[in-house]
């Protein structure tokens, strides 16, 4: 479960930076030239919101490789690497997607999938996962990650993040305009947004961005149930995924950046912000599902 640090932090950072650049370019003066132009602001918020989410999505794979120290398996160096590649290949063919890049990285038990497009994704597993699980359990985890790719979860989460970003940008500027107008209510010579507007919007972009992450995390948890069921379907039976979840429940999962946590296999953060449901809920959902 690896994602309450990178996609979110990258996304918030991109939105804040774009907001500052827009201020420096005078966009805010245009929006407030004759009072707050709500129509123009909504269009601006839409561009900013989805722009931040799309940039984060496009950056997801290179950031994952760099931040996790992933080694791409182009030519397997041992039996484990050859088995991982062939397992990903078999599941990809069964799921109807092109073969993702396959990687391995040093770390405690975990795995993740990422990438902007389902036919050019990355699936990576940790050395700790290979050492701490049976092959059948690792196979189930790989199936879970391939299911994420086949379900288009990265794009889905980016679209949800884009909607939330739009609300964040819109609300922060409406509130910023109100605060700035109040602070300068006795200044008849003022024109355009002041320092109160800029400070308020930057602070609210960050604060509201983290509140929006709670909603994004809820959607992410629902995608995890689907990926668990997808792994069971790819393997033709659900017990290996259930066994893998039980095993992970007794392990200490490896830490991952936030942008990867929603596409990982387990997590270790507060429930509201957690991108993954509790292990016991996932096991119960899988046991009660119609998969395999």
Curated annotation (Swiss-Prot):
Cofactors: Zn(2+)
Binding locations of Zn(2+): 144, 148, 224
Entry's transmembrane regions: 4-24, 38-58, 152-172, 199-219
Enzyme class: hydrolase
Keyword Cell membrane: yes
EC number(s) on file: 3.4.24.-
Catalytic residues identified in the record: 145
Main location: membrane
Cofactor binding note from Swiss-Prot or TrEMBL: Binds 1 zinc ion per subunit.
Membrane topology: Multi-pass membrane protein
GO biological process: proteolysis
Keyword Transmembrane helix appears in the UniProt entry: yes
Domain of life: Bacteria
Alphabetical list of CDD domains matching this protein: M48B_HtpX_like (cd07335)
GO molecular function: metalloendopeptidase activity; zinc ion binding
This protein's GO CC annotations: plasma membrane
Cellular localization per UniProt: Cell inner membrane
Keywords: Cell inner membrane, Cell membrane, Hydrolase, Membrane, Metal-binding, Metalloprotease, Protease, Transmembrane, Transmembrane helix, Zinc
Family that this chain belongs to: Belongs to the peptidase M48B family.
Protein's name according to its UniProt entry: Protease HtpX homolog
UniProt lineage: Bacteria, Pseudomonadati, Pseudomonadota, Betaproteobacteria, Burkholderiales
